[in-house]
Amino acid sequence: MERRNLALLCAGVVCFWLFALAFGTAQGKGLRIQPVVQAQAEPAVQTLTVTPPQLTLPCRAAILIDQTSGAVLYEMNADQTMPIASITKVMTLLLTFEAVHAGRLTMDTAVPVSEHAYHMGGSQIWLEPGEQFTLDEMLKAICVSSANDAAVAVAELVGGSEPAFVQQMNARAAELGMEHTTFRNACGLDTEGHLSTARDVAIMSRTILNTCPEVLHYTGIWTDTLRGGQTQLVNTNKLLRRYNGITGLKTGTTGGAGVCITASATRDGLNLIAVVLGAPSSKERFEAATTLLDYGFAAYRAAPVPLPQERPLQLKVKGSTEETVPLDYAALPQTALLPAESAGQLTVQLELPDTLEAPVTRGQTVGKAQLLCGEAVQGEYPVCAAADAPRMEFGTALQLLWDSLRGAAA
């Protein structure tokens, strides 16, 4: 009698699994719990309520952004195309650091000097054909003295030639959404069609600061030497000695561009980027950057984002060999940009399903975290799966069923 009941139980369970799998296959996505946020969703830019004043800026174009969120805090003619002089070297530096991150170069890699690099005009360290420096030394020359010959030598190392490297520069600019930028060379000398905007410069600057923070090791150097002390390097960014919290980033001056700067600064966890293009003099360039940064630090603050203490660390998964999937809250920023006078408390509200349906892939968005200041929504960020949970195959299900039945019979 017991053997008959066991056989009937087995037959019933097998039929159930066959029906469930067949139904799931026929219905496809209809059986699966849909994520609250679509997969790979981008964090929303924070909503800010501060009305910026009319600043007096002695330049053709300017923009001030929060480095962490990308929020625009002030802008003036930010989409007007114009030459950007040696600020071009920010893209040269970005591609170089990315080559280092990819393992193609190290800071000890020897950088040869070609005839082409030797003939660069403008600011330089007077490289000689056949002379070699390490990449570390060349980066100092670019970041501190804005050396055009060093920038071209590095571009040739990374891209094979300057024209090939310029193609990489334009491709990377397109990837970053720099819609009004076209590069014609790696150093920023005035060339027809070599144009950008204050907004695009801010995008480029934010990218290198967020993804290659080691650039600040070089942009923060005030003085250094090369050739065993024979060549003196003095930083062209005088704000390093004049402005509290300045960290970089790059100056630029040509006849076509005027006097320019993209300046990065940090105070009390608030990281700002001020871009000034087309100032009539170096003095007015630094004055404009100072005005922008002073406004930003006075009008805004960086508030720590509190993660809910009782947040779920994992979610249950149906139809998988994995019972649960761990959750990744890394998209939530550590700090949030708030108006300085804001008295509201930051909170995080989570929207997550009770369970997930397999398959689940690592990095898939499974919910969202809403950042609030009082009742005002400051931003929304994806909550992602931190591991895979593959869909259980029919054979695996039968094996698990058989093992469980054998255990029950024993």
In which residue ranges do the predicted regions lie?
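Active-site-adjacent loops and short helices of periplasmic peptidoglycan-processing enzymes
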Residues: E2-N5, A26-C212
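Domain-terminus/edge residues, biased toward the C-terminal soluble/receptor-binding domains
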Residues: M178-T182, D190-L195, R199-A410
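Generic alpha-helix initiation/capping and coil-helix boundary signal
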Residues: V13-C15, V166, S282
